[in-house]
């Protein structure tokens, strides 16, 4: 691996910044100052230090984002802002992608990673990874709707697996409900279509959980952070 790529992967800085740091003599390889960005290094055997601190290479990275409305769950889009546009240069340099998608007008928990194997496992229909959503609904959800969700709703193109619907609150005067929905699938507009099947309309949708991962309530919309060690270990163990 090239030295500059290694330094970017270790979050020392972006590519331009890394080259300047090398020129400044702030990087050593096996105890010797190194200024060549093109130097080929062995990330497992060579000791690379930045300002005296040993750098450890990480192949995969994992970010939790509180996706805002209006951002596309994609790596690029000609018309809309993408979730990658919300990351800084260092995070984008890791070549991460969204593990699954949230609709443009849906907000909440989104996992960004460059670990294709984990992403595939989380999205595999065979694993039935639960995802929980909070929805504001125009209309009054009822116990009958709870039972309809539990049986599995027959939509036009597929029949939903049994899902859990919890009615959190109902406001008869405003004709609205707040519900919590847990599904093991993630089809296009699925929660909205399930609610529409019951004759109501989702007006706001937020994803709260995906498998063991729970949205950090301290993350504002558009903010992101690395997964904690505990979060990552639990997530990896859940698909092992």
Briefly describe each language-model feature range:
Residues 1-240:
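Basic, flexible Lys/Arg- and Gly-enriched helix-loop patches that mediate nucleic-acid binding at interfaces
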């Amino acid at each position: 691996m090239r030295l500059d790529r290694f330094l970017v992967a270790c979050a020392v800085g972006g590519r331009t910044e890394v080259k300047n740091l090398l020129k400044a003599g702030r990087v050593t390889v096996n105890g010797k100052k190194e200024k060549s960005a093109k130097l080929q290094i062995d990330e497992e055997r060579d000791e690379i230090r930045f300002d005296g601190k040993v750098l450890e290479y990480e192949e995969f990275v994992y970010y939790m984002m509180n996706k805002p409305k209006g951002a596309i769950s994609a790596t690029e889009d000609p018309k809309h802002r993408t979730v990658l546009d919300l990351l800084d240069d260092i995070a984008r340099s890791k070549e991460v992608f969204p593990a699954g998608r949230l609709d443009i007008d849906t907000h909440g928990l989104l996992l960004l990673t460059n670990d294709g194997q984990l992403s595939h496992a989380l999205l595999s229909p065979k694993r039935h990874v639960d995802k929980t959503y909070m929805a504001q609904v125009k209309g009054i959800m009822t116990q009958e709707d709870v039972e309809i969700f539990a049986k599995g709703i027959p939509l036009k193109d597929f029949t939903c697996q049994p899902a859990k619907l919890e009615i959190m609150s109902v406001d008869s005067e405003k004709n609205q409900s707040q519900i919590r929905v847990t599904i093991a699938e993630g089809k296009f507009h699925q929660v909205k279509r399930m609610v529409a099947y019951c004759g109501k309309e989702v007006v706001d949708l937020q994803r709260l959980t995906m498998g063991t991962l729970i949205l950090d309530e301290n993350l504002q919309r558009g903010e992101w952070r690395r997964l904690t060690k505990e979060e990552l270990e639990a997530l990896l163990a859940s698909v092992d």
